[in-house]
């Protein structure tokens, strides 16, 4: 959306933006101020007059055609929008290149700066070294996140051309990627490094070396992680790196060195923007207009505007006020300007520690530690302490430190300066003691005493990097020479509506002898009184939060004790150390495909679009240039989970300037046209008289701009009559709320087997859902044509044909009038298989009504609210075994939360039942599956499609049986593992069965049992830190379970010049499908890979396509292309015989003049499959992809924090078509699976039924530093695949590795067993997935967690619901 250029605002407009008196006075104050911003963009000067202050930098960039910068979340949490802003740093007076989030940066804030986007540093013809190395290093799959990652690395290199490995490892803490698993990105980035020093992060003033606490079983990380650039090059199949030449970078424009900042004032009816250049000007504004919103980095303000619908009539930008960004060292305190950036504050803290020494510098070490995990680098580059203080967030990481250190806040107004002790600053929730007309000018942070004072800061969150705190704390104590407590501050965030001191605990501690054991116990008891949380406390997690408060103090107490009485018998030294990470590394077996490499097939190579993606030139749906007369759509969504629709009033919305129309069910050709769904047509595009889930579309507002459309949608007034709501599986079971579809598999005689079993064990296993979190949200452009009702649909969909069918339905024409096109997706993972149809249908309805193009790209919160997730599952099981552990029988009821409609839930449940055996033989089995009908968004396909849920239940059963029998779980797996030729419980023979072989290989290659002995020794000597291991096998059936979908078509053209154009039915969504298909065609036709091209996927070139899903697309489309190429080769055979040395150009030329058809339509359908439910007959899958993974983790049992130490993955992918692509799929799937089973927790508001976790702020996919510290991947080799009848004898690899991520979960469970055993608890642990830090902590059985447990009172329920 291009920003509007406004005329100079009139006085009436200004009065609308400010109170009347303030407006008049402000006009008088600012009448001489400038209304023009001047900046440079990619080296070119830009001058803009009277800019709309509501426009973000991202909107401006995309509006002028620089679409390489992407919108991923609109809240600064994913990094897809990262650009670099270069300026003379007001604090250091040096040039600094800051990576920032363009999605939350106001355009008007870049005055006097140089903005650099991904387009500005290189292109496909002349790429930057970063872009080229990332591309050939396989660091880009779907590519939507890639420009942001490129720019984060670019910022690092511009500031430090030879960064350390540690700096590179941490450079991406503000970026997310959903595809790659991060390893290849880090490998490419590390090629720029100069390795020095140990890679461990510093904490609490320590040196940071991993050997300091003797924690590493493998020695210092420095010894294992240092690599030269040459070493890094060997990680890639093609090490032809472009040389990095820092002296050829874009220069900082000379005119900006002498750019003189001028005060700015401009705006419109809605908003006025001021940029003072002196503090005096700022104070004058505040005196006239105390309610003016002060903006430093805009990191919080933009979110308030976007998601909380806050409106600020007047904003004052402080980012360029040098006076507020200075610092000064004094004898006993450091004074910092309150608007200093957090990045600069990190550097200042380093200087302070060096100046004051480690003892007196403890406050600055504490601040620096909190900053290390404070948001991402892009946020820290612009955010400030003043912003933290003014917003008064109860979970701010810095505020507890300021309170605990007795920092003084200096507030200035026009007529006075006020000193406010931080202990008195916070008054209530988001309320402070700051006078309305004052600004936070500076902070005076006292140094600690040279002796006797101890300060530590702590934080626990769901994910280590870029995550808000669950609980944080700053704990300080001052001791006399006799160790009596003379002063104490115990300050916590996340325990109350504001940053709060533990008053009872502080009172108890004061005057006590610190080294007396009774002091610890008494303080813990007092903390229980301070934080007596209720079970239903807002924010939830009552037990966990209480345990963290107690645990932080327990750690602090022993840390201090270790400093003053290192040999005390009361010292629990093992509790002091926190988890640290080494520089991550990994190895791949690059020789795995050597034995069967052909001219093209079997050879490693990058994704063919990788370089376009890295340079920002790859085009996605919303990058398509605006069409003439195009409108933007924004959906009106239900805010109730279950209610009657009483009225929908659009009058106010249609009055908003720029709003054109409203579309709903009345605009469809018939009531029947409103119904959609696959395979059951049980969902409506637009709600009619009732809504059955929050987030259900009611209508769509059309407007000239996205902003106007969003404002219009919010202005639609909907009146409801609420109805009873069912959210969770348990609630659905209790209410018997199920869809009719029921499936079962029965084999053998379970009843008799249970009677004969030595042991019968029963249990319940539960697994949460998972948000797809593709970086590109659902997007669509519907373009009506002038004739015959034709329409062109550009949709971010995995399913062009179904999109075509339903667009035809809602527009009332035949399918031959609709062309559905897809260039590429920014990720899909199943979330765009059916759910993309909803947006396409609504956009098409709107376009048909107004006869104008309609565009819509969902915001992240809208996408999560409407598009569904992986199904949560619940399994109640009973298993019979012999005393030796041989499995005899399994009986299980499996329930899936389908949501408010069925979507693909039936097929998802079917696959879960077929995978509930994993790799184990249950000779007698009866498993049943039901779909729960609830008032949540309809859950849908997600990578694995029910398979991971069934596999998880199998491994949960195996783990619990092993514990019941006190057997080694690794041996129990071997005892019950299928052998070659065995039949599954759905009567399919296991051919080319290699799991036992791979299991043995992984045990040996990972030195599993030797390391397990080391883990046992570690656990024996570490009370509060435990390690665990697991080795998890898998098999995954490849084929659509719906038989008719196992078919594909292709169209291959050979042109006169010998170039080849291929079209097929599959969609490129980052998995490298087009790359593999191009390779197949190039091999078959005997031409170079560069001579073959795939442009797009479209329904007018290949019709009746199956969705790109089920890991079957390479098999299906590959053989269809091969079939077409075979036809062409047969036609060219006579010419090859006549001209054996001719090129394809020569052959095509000759054949054309002989009137030979140089186009061929290929087709393939999977043979010999077709399963009949109920009869348990027929072959369900064409083959099984197999794998084994060994994982090792470390958990902090005091906090629930954890880190993956190592993963060794081996996959059987047959004869790989392209090992680079397959390795990328394996690594990406593993990390996505690790997220599924650990960090990714979806939560719903109990009171409203709306999803709470609807963005990166509170839904945590794994980040760069969540991957295994050692991440090894290999492919099975040196075997024959005698029965594999696929293209190249390759196996599908997209979905199968995802379950391997559960190895981290089961390793955590193993560590928890050790933690519980430490305290004498040996009960069998039934661990719910995901194993979040909360679940890890509350599963421990130590005295601290037991005293922290919060029980629900009668009728009391948890704040959030896990459905």
Swiss-Prot record:
Classification lineage: Eukaryota, Fungi, Dikarya, Ascomycota, Pezizomycotina
Stated name of the protein: Xanthine dehydrogenase
Summary of the function given for this chain in its UniProt record: Key enzyme in purine degradation. Catalyzes the oxidation of hypoxanthine to xanthine. Catalyzes the oxidation of xanthine to uric acid.
Residues that, per the record, bind substrate: 833, 911, 945, 1041
Family statement: Belongs to the xanthine dehydrogenase family.
Gene Ontology cellular component terms for the protein in this record: peroxisome
Location within or outside the cell: Peroxisome
Regions crossing the membrane: none
Domain FAD-binding PCMH-type stretches: 266-450
Catalytic residues as annotated in Swiss-Prot or TrEMBL: 1295 (proton acceptor)
Residues holding [2Fe-2S] cluster 2: 142, 145, 177, 179
Alphabetic keyword roster: 2Fe-2S, FAD, Flavoprotein, Iron, Iron-sulfur, Metal-binding, Molybdenum, NAD, Oxidoreductase, Peroxisome
């Amino acid at each position: 959306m291009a920003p509007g250029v406004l005329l100079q605002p009139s006085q009436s407009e200004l009065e609308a933006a400010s109170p009347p008196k303030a407006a008049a006075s402000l006009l008088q104050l600012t009448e001489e101020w400038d209304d023009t911003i001047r900046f440079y963009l990619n080296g070119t000067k830009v001058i803009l007059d009277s800019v709309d202050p509501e426009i973000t930098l991202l909107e401006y960039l995309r509006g002028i055609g620089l679409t390489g910068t992407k919108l991923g979340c609109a809240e600064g949490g994913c990094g897809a929008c990262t650009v670099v802003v270069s300026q003379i740093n007001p604090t250091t007076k040096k040039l600094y290149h800051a990576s920032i989030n363009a999605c939350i940066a106001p355009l008007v804030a870049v005055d006097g700066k140089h903005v650099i986007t991904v387009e500005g540093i290189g292109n496909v013809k002349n790429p930057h070294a970063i872009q080229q190395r990332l591309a050939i290093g396989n660091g880009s799959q779907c590519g939507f996140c890639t420009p942001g990652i490129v720019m984060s690395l670019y910022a690092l290199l511009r500031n430090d051309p030879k960064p350390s490995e540690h700096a590179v490892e941490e450079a991406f803490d503000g970026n997310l990627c959903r595809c790659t698993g991060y390893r290849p990105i880090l490998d490419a980035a590390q090629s720029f490094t100069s390795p020095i020093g140990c890679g461990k992060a510093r904490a609490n003033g320590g040196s940071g070396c991993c050997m300091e606490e003797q924690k590493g079983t493998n020695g210092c990380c420095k010894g294992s992680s240092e690599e030269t650039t040459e070493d890094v090059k060997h990680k890639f199949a093609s090490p032809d790196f472009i040389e990095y030449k820092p002296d050829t970078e874009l220069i900082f424009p000379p005119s900006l060195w002498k750019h003189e900042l001028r005060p700015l004032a401009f705006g419109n009816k809605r908003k006025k923007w001021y940029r003072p250049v002196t503090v005096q000007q700022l104070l004058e504004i505040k005196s006239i207009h105390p309610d003016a919103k002060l903006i430093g980095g805009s990191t919080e303000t933009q979110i308030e505007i976007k998601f909380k619908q806050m409106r600020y009539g007047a904003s004052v930008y402080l980012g360029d006020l040098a006076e507020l960004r200075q610092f000064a060292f004094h004898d006993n305190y450091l004074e910092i300007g309150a608007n200093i950036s957090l990045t600069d504050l990190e550097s200042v803290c380093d200087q302070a520690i060096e100046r004051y020494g480690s003892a007196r510098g403890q406050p600055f070490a504490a601040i620096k530690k909190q900053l290390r995990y404070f948001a991402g680098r892009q946020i820290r580059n612009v955010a400030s302490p003043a912003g933290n203080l003014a917003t008064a967030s109860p979970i701010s990481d810095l505020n507890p430190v300021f309170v605990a250190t007795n920092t003084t806040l200096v507030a200035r107004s026009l007529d006075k300066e006020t000193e406010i002790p931080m202990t008195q600053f916070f008054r209530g929730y988001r309320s402070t003691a700051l006078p309305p007309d004052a600004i936070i000018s500076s902070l005076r942070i006292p140094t600690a005493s040279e002796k006797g004072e101890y300060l530590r800061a702590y934080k626990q969150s769901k994910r280590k990097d870029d995550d808000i705190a669950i609980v944080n704390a700053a704990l300080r104590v001052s001791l006399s020479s006799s160790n009596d407590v003379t002063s104490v501050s115990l300050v916590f965030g996340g325990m109350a509506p504001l940053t709060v001191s533990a008053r009872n605990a502080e009172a108890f501690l004061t005057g006590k002898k610190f080294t007396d054991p009774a002091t610890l116990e008494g303080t813990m008891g007092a903390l229980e009184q301070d934080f007596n949380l209720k079970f239903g406390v807002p924010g939830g997690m009552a037990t966990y939060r209480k345990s963290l408060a107690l645990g932080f103090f327990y750690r602090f107490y022993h840390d201090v004790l270790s400093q003053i009485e290192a040999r005390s018998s009361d010292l629990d030294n093992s509790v002091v150390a926190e988890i640290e990470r080494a520089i991550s590394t990994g190895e791949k077996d690059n020789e795995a495909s050597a034995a069967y490499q052909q001219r093209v097939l079997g050879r490693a190579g990058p994704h063919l679009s990788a370089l376009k993606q890295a340079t920002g030139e790859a085009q996605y749906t919303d990058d398509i240039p605006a069409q003439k007369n195009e409108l933007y759509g924004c959906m009106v969504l239900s805010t109730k989970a279950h209610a009657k629709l009483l009225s929908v009033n659009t009058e106010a919305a249609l009055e908003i300037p720029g709003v054109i129309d409203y579309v709903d069910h009345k605009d469809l050709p018939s009531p029947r046209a409103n119904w959609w769904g696959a395979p059951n047509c049980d969902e409506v595009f637009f709600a009619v008289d009732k809504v059955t889930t929050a987030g259900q579309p009611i209508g769509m507002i059309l407007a000239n701009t996205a902003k106007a459309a969003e404002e219009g949608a919010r202005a639609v007034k909907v009146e409801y009559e609420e109805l009873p709501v069912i959210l969770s599986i348990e609630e659905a079971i209790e209410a018997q709320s199920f869809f009719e579809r029921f499936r079962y598999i029965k084999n053998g005689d379970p009843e008799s087997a249970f009677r004969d079993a030595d042991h019968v064990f029963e249990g319940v296993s539960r697994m949460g859902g998972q948000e797809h979190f593709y970086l590109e949200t659902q997007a669509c452009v519907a373009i009506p044509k002038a004739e015959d009702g034709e329409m062109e649909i550009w949709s971010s969909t995995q399913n062009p044909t179904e999109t075509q069918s339903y667009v035809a339905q809602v527009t009332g024409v035949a399918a031959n009038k609709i062309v559905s096109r897809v260039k590429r997706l920014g990720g899909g993972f199943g979330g765009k298989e059916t759910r993309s149809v909803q947006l396409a249908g609504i956009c098409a309805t709107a376009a048909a009504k107004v006869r104008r193009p309609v565009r819509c790209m969902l915001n992240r919160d809208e996408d999560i609210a409407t598009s569904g997730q992986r199904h949560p599952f619940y399994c109640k099981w009973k298993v019979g075994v012999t005393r030796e552990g041989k499995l005899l029988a399994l009986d299980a009821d499996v329930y899936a939360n389908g949501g408010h409609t069925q979507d693909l839930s039936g097929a998802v449940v079917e696959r879960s039942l077929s995978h509930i055996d994993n790799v184990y033989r249950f000779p007698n089995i009866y498993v049943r599956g039901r779909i729960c009908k609830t008032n949540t968004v309809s859950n849908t396909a997600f990578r694995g499609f029910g398979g991971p849920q069934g596999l998880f239940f199998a491994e949960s059963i195996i783990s619990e049986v092993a514990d019941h029998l006190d057997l080694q779980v690794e041996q129990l797996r071997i005892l019950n593992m299928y052998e070659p030729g065995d039949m599954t419980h759905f009567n399919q023979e296991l051919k080319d069965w290699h799991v036992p072989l791979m299991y043995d290989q992984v045990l040996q290659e990972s030195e599993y049992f030797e390391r397990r002995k080391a883990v046992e020794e570690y656990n024996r000597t570490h009370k509060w830190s435990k390690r665990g291991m697991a080795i998890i096998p898998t098999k995954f059936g490849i084929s659509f379970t719906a038989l008719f979908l196992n078919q594909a078509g292709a169209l291959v053209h050979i042109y006169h010049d010998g170039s080849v154009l291929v079209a097929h039915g599959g969609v490129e969504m980052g998995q490298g499908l087009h790359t593999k298909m191009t390779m197949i065609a190039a091999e078959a036709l005997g031409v170079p890979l560069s001579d073959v091209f795939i442009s797009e996927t479209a329904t007018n070139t290949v019709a009746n396509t199956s969705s790109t899903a089920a890991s079957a697309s390479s098999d299906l489309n590959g053989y269809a292309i091969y079939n077409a190429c075979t036809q062409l080769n047969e036609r060219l055979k006579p010419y090859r015989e006549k001209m054996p040395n001719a090129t394809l150009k020569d052959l095509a030329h000759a054949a054309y003049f002989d009137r030979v058809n140089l186009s061929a339509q290929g087709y393939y359908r999977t043979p010999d499959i077709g399963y009949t439910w109920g009869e348990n007959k027929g072959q369900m899958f064409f083959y099984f992809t197999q794998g084994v993974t060994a994982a090792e983790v470390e958990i902090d049992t005091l906090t629930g924090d954890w880190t993956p130490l190592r993963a060794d993955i081996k996959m059987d992918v047959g004869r790989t078509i392209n090992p680079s692509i397959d390795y990328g799929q394996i690594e990406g799937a593993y990390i996505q699976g690790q997220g599924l089973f650990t960090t990714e927790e979806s939560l719903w508001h109990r009171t409203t039924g709306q999803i709470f976790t609807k963005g990166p702020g509170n839904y945590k996919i794994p980040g760069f530093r969540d991957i295994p510290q050692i991440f090894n991947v290999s492919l099975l080799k040196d075997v024959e695949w005698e029965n594999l009848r696929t293209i190249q004898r390759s196996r599908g690899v997209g979905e199968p590795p995802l379950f391997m991520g559960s190895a981290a979960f089961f390793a955590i469970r193993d560590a928890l067993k050790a933690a519980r055993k430490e305290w004498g608890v040996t009960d069998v642990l039934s661990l719910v997935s995901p194993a979040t830090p909360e679940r890890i902590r509350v599963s421990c059985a130590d005295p601290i967690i037991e005293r922290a447990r919060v029980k629900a009172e009668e009728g009391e329920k948890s704040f959030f619901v896990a459905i």
